[in-house]
């Protein structure tokens, strides 16, 4: 990767970084930043079965899979992965380097920080603020704001004593 610009000059080529989620998206973020620093334009992909309403904004190197519904006035940052069958409601902002798995329901007017993970079938009620580097576990229902680096698991929405800094190294 260090010499990629010699073989594929940024003035002639664009890229998509196809790395899956791991370690709170740290590797994907590292390659995103290095690729941008080399001068590359990064493409995003949205599956054709995803329904996107008007007034949608999306950053670079995003990957949105099949059968999502993305309502009006949604903003998605750079380097975001969104699995299948999600509902992202109106006026929602998703920060850079987040991973939304599948079957997630997000109410309207949600603000999500950077480097967050949302597990399978999680639900986030409307008008919720989620800080940076948070983990929302599978099946969790979020009914109140989530501070930076907090971890919520199970459908009881109990905050765990561990910080996402520690858990991020194992998932």
Task: Describe each region flagged by the PLM.
Residues 10-13, 30, 57, 133, ...:
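Surface-exposed beta-strand edges and their flanking turn/coil or helix-capping segments
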Residues 44-160:
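Structural signal for interior beta-strand "rungs" in well-ordered beta-sheet cores
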């Amino acid at each position: 990767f260090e010499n990629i610009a010699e073989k594929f000059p940024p003035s002639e080529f664009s890229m998509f970084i196809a790395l899956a989620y791991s370690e709170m998206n740290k590797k994907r973020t590292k390659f995103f930043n290095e690729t941008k620093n080399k001068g590359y334009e990064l493409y995003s992909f949205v599956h054709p079965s995803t329904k996107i309403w008007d007034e949608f904004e999306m950053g670079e190197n995003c990957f949105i899979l099949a059968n999502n519904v993305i309502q009006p006035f949604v903003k998605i940052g750079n380097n975001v992965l969104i699995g299948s069958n999600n509902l992202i409601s109106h006026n929602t902002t998703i920060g850079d380097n987040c991973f939304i798995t599948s079957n997630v329901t997000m109410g309207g007017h949600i603000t999500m920080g950077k480097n967050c993970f949302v597990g399978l079938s999680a639900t986030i009620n409307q008008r919720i603020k989620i800080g940076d580097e948070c983990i929302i576990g599978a099946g969790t229902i979020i009914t109140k704001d989530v501070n930076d680096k907090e971890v919520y698991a199970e459908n009881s929405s109990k905050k765990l004593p561990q910080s996402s800094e520690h858990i991020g190294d194992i998932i």
